[in-house]
Amino acid sequence: MKKSIIIVLLFGFQLASAQKSNYSELIAKSGDKIEQKVIAWRHDIHQNPELGNREFRTAELITKHLQSLGIEVQTKVGITGVVGILKGDKPGPVIALRADMDALPVEETNGLPFASKVKTMYNGKETSVMHACGHDGHVAVLMGVAEVLAGMKKDLKGTVKFIFQPAEEGAPIGEEGGAYLMVKEGVLENPKVDVIFGLHMDSQVEVGNLTYRPGGTLAGVGDFKITVKGKPSHGSKPWFSVDPILVASQIVVSLQQIVSRNVKITDNAAVVTVGAINGGNRSNIIPAQVEMLGDVRAFTNEDETLIYSRIKQIAEKTAEAAGATALVELPYGVKYPVTFNNIELTNLMLPTLQKSAGVGNVFLVPANTGAEDFSFYAQKVPGLFFRLGGMPKGKDAKTAPPHHTPEFIIDDASFKLGVITFCNLVFDYAEMNKK
């Protein structure tokens, strides 16, 4: 009797392994077949970039493609967002895949034959627009994934939600947007999402490689604004003034001591940056006030609270000592939480990443002080966010143009691995979490 049970269990395990191997092989072949389509979509989107909450053409392209596959489509989610819902023929979990759609106000100078020449109005000024962060690749990859999975619908366990998100780089002034707004409008409900996966192109990781980190992988970020009010005077008679420029300068220098002297950096990194100082308009007039804008990046709530407290204390006390005042607003605007990769989920899906790229091409990396609004999804449901190498083979990561710069380049050869990895994550997770 025991021997029979063991044989049955062994047969079941072998059958499951064979089925898993079969769909992985089919996904790999499908990745080969769809690669040129994905590249063509990427070129089209790259040549026609759109800023946050204005991704009308991109959304229309996505919508038509999903509808052609017979996928249920919801439009205008979070202003310009598109959500596709693919129901497999077998019961299983609800798995979300996310791609962001927006471009940046950057003039492209990398010489690509499909480089952007688009110009638009941004903050009242005409500006060039460029996909300088790889979001064109994200969209093209997820469009490819949708086509592959739609073709495997009869074998698909559960439901896949394709989330095409606007405004990851931030909504226009005075508007809500991005993942925050999509979550607010219920993108993770109806049907309720069990788990979410996201990827990001990386121009300084070689094509064919994936990188990941369990736990806090990207920093939480919150902006701050400090308004220093002093007393104006003629520049020739500074003794009649309380100089807000001098006070602001002292505050900037003192803020840099927070990370080096107050944060336990052996546990987690943190960053305090002042990115803008505005005050005065003539060389011989000491102005009445100065405004400063900056941001804080941290990986724990404790560090964030500490840094905010010290910013307020330093600004107010420095100003008071000089006879000025400092109004501190923090967080100022939308605050992004830490992008946290669920540790159990990350460990569970690591073999899938390794299967997709090859064991030797998947790398554990340190936490990154960049920020991502994927964090709003991962706050609500278990999430895994990983990076997809986009640097041409043979290039030096130290000299590869970074994200958000005019020379930024992502190699077309990178996208097939993105398609394969997303598809494998869906099938492997569904296989391990049958309902």
Give the role of each language-model region.
Residues 1-21:
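Bacterial Sec-dependent N-terminal signal peptides
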Residues 19-130, 140-157:
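Acidic/His- and Gly-rich active-site-bordering loop/insert found
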Residues 20, 68, 249-435:
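Metal-dependent amide/peptide-bond hydrolase catalytic core
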Residues 32-36, 49-60, 132, 136, ...:
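Soluble non-cytosolic domains of exported or imported proteins
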Residues 45, 84, 97, 135, ...:
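Divalent metal-coordination and catalytic microenvironments
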Residues 108-119, 215-219, 393-401:
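Short, flexible, mixed-charge acidic loops at enzyme active sites
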Residues 118-130, 136-137, 148-276, 281-285:
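Histidine/acidic-residue-rich, glycine-tolerant segments that coordinate divalent metal ions
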